[in-house]
Design a protein with these regions (language model features):
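Non-catalytic cap/lid and distal C-terminal segments of serine-dependent acyl enzymes
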Residues: 1-203
């Protein structure tokens, strides 16, 4: 369907269903409108699983280009959150990040403080995507306010922070899509553009 995109090996990792909110969040979230509801805090364990178990296995079993430049991570919604976190924690191993519809507003302050302590690499490639009609029923239980704007603001904050901390502008691409909702259809539509952006710097 997209013959112009470079050949690559894609590894898709199943999430843990309802527990994905734990494994994709590096920090605990305790501000739900539902009394007693909290989640998150297992993102570090998930990141270690990906980088210490999954990646070495794939590199051993398949003919990969295992260097940083040819290693990418892409995630949507909460998967975007853990992609942002791992992009900081494993910046020496992950050269490309695809952050789709990140729900980072769930722990924006914690992420910003963590990012402030990191030294970013100017050559890390980061593709950011967000729609103007983001939000789902779960979001409404977690935040009282304009959720659609929260998605946009969080993505813009990440974009500005990357620039402010020295990532070259040519290595960042942001796409805000008018009318796009929080779903797989929108993410699939924009995935080819993300992959092309990554491959521009591949040898």
């Amino acid at each position: 369907r997209n013959p112009d995109i470079s050949r690559m090996i894609v590894v898709a990792i199943d999430n843990d269903g309802p527990n994905r909110m734990n494994e994709y969040s590096a920090w605990k979230y305790q501000e739900s409108n539902i009394p007693g509801v909290q989640f998150g805090g297992k993102g570090v364990e998930y990141a270690e699983f990906v980088m210490d178990v999954v990646k070495p296995f794939i590199d051993k079993e398949y003919r990969t280009l295992s260097d940083r430049q040819h290693t990418a991570m892409i995630g949507s919604s909460l998967g975007g959150n853990i992609t942002q976190f791992m992009g900081l924690d494993y910046k020496d191993q992950i050269g490309c990040l695809g952050v789709f519809s990140s729900a980072n507003w769930l722990h924006q302050d914690a992420f910003d403080r963590y990012m402030d302590r990191q030294k970013l690499d100017s050559d890390q490639r980061v593709y950011i995507y967000v729609g103007t009609e983001e939000a789902d029923d779960t979001d409404k239980t977690l935040m009282a306010g304009n959720i659609k704007q929260a998605y946009i603001d969080s993505s813009l904050s990440y974009y500005h922070d990357l620039i402010a901390r020295g990532v070259d502008l040519e290595n960042i691409k942001i796409h805000i899509q008018s009318g796009a909702e929080h779903n797989e259809e929108a993410w699939a539509e924009n995935l080819p553009d993300c992959l092309r952006f990554f491959a521009e710097k591949w040898d």
